[in-house]
A protein has these predicted regions:
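Serine-esterase "nucleophile elbow" of acetyl-processing enzymes
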Residues: 1-47, 51-60, 177
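Alpha-helical cap/lid subdomain in secreted, periplasmic
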Residues: 30, 50-188
Length: 188
């Protein structure tokens, strides 16, 4: 079976839901690919870039999914720094001829996150920066001819369905929506 490595943060890992409810683990359960979930709760793009060789490149996977940036924004980092890090990871994955998919991070809900996750003054900055991150990621995907999954738009469209656990992370319904969209994009 072909190897598919998913690298990212808690949105890739499946924070807050049972393992079998995580969108990445649902893809693994299809038994069509050998899936490695390298999502780490709280991870940022500098950290992902730092571990990219060990977790991804050295394994020579046929497919790579990469999503990050929300935690960077929650640390006050710029969209440019996120894009620079993701671009380096794209170049590295292309150097081993992997098929790459970029995840565009979902929206966040600052009011809900302040109440249910933890208080932070940076939620509004993150919320305002995510559309810019989305636009820059779309440009990056176009420049490198890389596929993407637009979880930002997907979550925006499904917001009325109560898909969030805490304003940042998705609940089991949110993960199911992500899983179905990923299956379409991955042709599974």
């Amino acid at each position: 079976m072909k190897k598919f490595i998913f690298i990212g943060d808690s949105l890739t890992y499946g924070y807050g839901v049972y393992r079998e409810e995580s969108w990445v683990n649902k893809i693994s359960a299809l038994n069509k690919l050998t899936v490695f979930n390298k999502g780490i709760n709280g991870d940022t793009t500098p950290s992902m870039l730092n571990r990219f060789f060990n977790d991804v490149t050295s394994k020579i996977p046929e497919y790579v999914f990469l999503m990050g940036g929300t935690n960077d924004l929650l640390c006050g980092r710029s969209v440019k720094s996120i894009i620079d890090n993701i671009e380096e990871m794209i170049k590295e994955a292309l150097s081993i001829k992997s098929n790459i998919f970029i995840g565009i991070p979902p929206i966040i809900i600052p009011k809900m996150a302040n109440k249910l996750f933890m208080p932070s003054d940076l939620y509004n900055y993150c919320e305002k920066s995510l559309p810019l991150l989305r636009a820059e990621l779309l440009n990056l995907c176009s420049n490198y001819n890389v596929s993407y999954i637009d979880f930002y738009t997907l979550c925006n469209k499904n917001l009325y369905k109560n898909i969030f656990l805490d304003g940042i992370h998705l609940n089991s319904l949110g993960n199911d929506i992500m899983f179905k969209e990923a299956c379409k994009i991955f042709s599974l």
